[in-house]
Amino acid sequence: MEFNAWVAYRVIVDLVLGTDLAAYLVFCLAHMEAPESFGLLDLVLYVVGVSLCLFNIWAKSDAHRVLGDYAWYWGDFFFLFKKDLTFDGIFQMFPHPMYTVGYAFYYGLGLITRSKQVIVVSFCAHMLQLLFLVFVENPHIEKIYGTAFSGEKEQLETKMVEKGMLLSLFVCIEY
């Protein structure tokens, strides 16, 4: 029963994520500001923006490789498949990469579109994801996998989340 519910949930997640991406891309296109003349700043914005988008694709692909479908689709919310947490690949570089650096794509598109509205929406979406991490994901991980997850790793994650919030805020204010 739980497995069937999880499979149905995966379909819903894919639909929501797909429509979320499509809506965000349409929003970006609607707010894109083409430069009047192409200069060095424009080149830098495009190169950094495309680099952030490519980094995001790599980060999410590597996270899926490490996690697999079970963890990618929050399988342990539905049924317990006793496994230890895996800290490999991107997880060795960034704690919770889906929440900390997983929004590089949004910021990259914000730079490419040269739109303050896109940057602000990207920032707000990122902050909502970090709130989900703090209030849903982390308590769930501690409940399922125990307090061995706590300690140094949690302190590092808290610092990274705070730095991610500060970096996002800085990008939003500066742009």
Q: Model segments located where?
A:
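Membrane-anchoring alpha-helices and their flanking helix-loop junctions
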Residues: M1-F91, T100-Y175
